Amino acid sequence: MQTDIEIAQSVEIKPITKIATTAGLQANEIEPYGYDKAKINLDPSIVRKQELGKLILVTSINPTPAGEGKSTVTVGLADALNLADKKTMIALREPSLGPVMGLKGGATGGGFAQVVPMADINLHFTGDFHALTSAHDTLAALLDNSIHQGNPLNIDPRRILWKRVVDINDRELRHVTVGLGGPTSGVPREDGFDITVASELMAILTLSTDLMDMKERIKRIVVGYTYSKEPVTVADLGVAGALTVLLKDAIKPNLVQTLAHTPAIIHGGPFANIAQGTNSILATKTALKLADYVVTEAGFGADLGGEKFLDVKVPLLGKTPDTIVIVATVRALKHHGGVALSNLNNEDVTALRNGLENLGQHLTAMNRYGVPVLVAINRFTSDTEAELQVIKDYVQQFGATAYTTEVWAKGGAGAQELAAAVIKKSAQEADFTPLYQADDSAIDKLNTIVQTIYGGTGVELSTKAQKQLQDFKKYGWDKLPIIMAKTQYSFTDDAKKLGAPKDFKIYIREFVPKLGAGFLVALTGSIMTMPGLPKHPAALDIDIDENGTITGLF
C-alpha cells in the first residue's frame, strides 16, 4: 500500500497559475512562490460575486491521538462537490511543524484526498510561521529591552505575560530563566516558551480583516503589567508598526491545490485546544467570494474547534455555515466505548454502542446552533458492515443522516453520497442561533459552553482565576468571547475520561487576556501551551535520499 507522501509524489501537480485561473483569480492577483504555491494579494477587486458561496463546516467527534481523518474528509468532500459540477474551494489551516515532527503528523489530508505540495505545506510552506515566530520574539526582545533601558513604562518583570515562541514541541522550554550574566545581559526573570501556534499574533493573523485591522489588533496586545498592576500594551511600547511590517506577507492567504486540482486556500494555523483552531477570516472570505461552495474545517472536535468557529469566527466572518459535517470513525467510537488503542481493528459492536454517546453529545451540541448537521463516517479497512450500520441507525434520533466515505482510497469519488446530501442540506434556510450573547458575563459564557457543548454542570474557578475576573471587570474585559483551552480527547478537562461523561465541572486554573485577538483564554486542567514530544516522534521515520525524495511524512 502506498503511503500518503508516495501518493502525493505520484500525482502530477498543475502550475499554480492554472489553479488560480480555475479559482477565478487574475495573474496580477497572485504572487507565485515557485511552480505550485502562491500568495493571494489583499485586493478588494477579488470580489467576483455579490453573494457569498455556501459554507460547509467540517468538524469531528473527540479524536484518538492519531486523529480521525477530518482534513482527509474535508478535501475529499470538496473534490466530490467539484465532481458534482459545483464550483468549490477549500479553506484550511496551515500545519504546525511541532506535530509534523511529533505524534499527530501533518494536516494535508491523506491518501487520494490531499492538498499538495504535501511536503512543502507540512514543513516551511511560504514562511508564514517563520514570520510569526520572528514577529513574536521581536516583541519579546523589545519588551525586555524596555525594562533594561531604564524601564520607562514601569513594567513589573514578575508580571510579564508575553513569552517567547518556537514552532517545535519542546517541553524543556516551558520554564526558563532569562537575563542571567550580569548587568550587561538584561534583567533576570522567569520566562518560558509557547509553541508558535499558541501566539496571540497567530490568533490576530487569522481574525484580522485587512492589514490595518491587524495593526490595530497588535496595538491592543497586553504584554504585562506595571508595578501598580496596570496593563501594558504594544501601543505603549510603540512597536506595532514594526511588528506589522514583519507580518505584511504572512497576512496574505496561500493558494495551493488538491490532488484532483480543486483550488485550496491554506492560511493560519492556531490549535483548537489552546486557541481558536480556525483558518483565517481572509482565506475563508476570499474563497466565499470566488466559489459557490467552500469547505472548511475547525481543529479537533466539535467541542473545541467547532464551538470556537461558531462563536468566535462567525461573528467576524459575517457568514454562518450552511451545513455542519461531523466526522466520526468506528475506531474512535470503539475507543470511547472502552477498547484499547491496540485492539481497535477488531469488530466490537458492544463497545461501539457504548462509545456512540460521544457522537450523540456532539450532535446535540451542533444541533443547538440551528444549522443542518450531517455525519461522515471516515471508513477504515477494518470497519465491518455491522459496525457501520449501528452508527447510521443511531444518528437518526438526532435528526441526522450518516454517510460512509472512502476518500482516502477513492478521493472525491468516495464521498459522492455525502456531497449530494451537503448540496441538498445547504439549499435549506439555516436558522443560526449563537450559543451566548456578546454582553453575557465571562462566567455565564463559561457555564453555557460547559453545559450546552460538553454536557457538564458548569465551571469551577481557582482563587487566581476568580481574582483575575475581578480585575478584568475593572479593565472592561469581562465580556469578551471565551476560548476554552482544554484537552481534545474528552469533553472534560481530563483526557482519560472518554465517551460522554455527566455531572462534571471544568476546572479553570487561570485566564490569559488576549485583547488583540479579542478574547479571554481559559486554561483548564493540565493543558499546556507548549507540547512535548512522544516516546517515538514522527521525526524518527522521516528521511530524504540523494535525489531529494522525502519519505516518512504523513
Curated annotation (Swiss-Prot):
Gene Ontology biological process: tetrahydrofolate interconversion
Origin: domain of life: Bacteria
Catalytic activity: (6S)-5,6,7,8-tetrahydrofolate + formate + ATP = (6R)-10-formyltetrahydrofolate + ADP + phosphate
Chain sites annotated for binding ATP: T64, P65, A66, G67, E68, G69, K70, S71
Any one Gene Ontology molecular-function term assigned to this protein's record: ATP binding
Pathway connected to this protein: One-carbon metabolism; tetrahydrofolate interconversion
Family indicated by similarity: Belongs to the formate--tetrahydrofolate ligase family.
The protein's name in its UniProt record: Formate--tetrahydrofolate ligase
Gene name in the database record: fhs
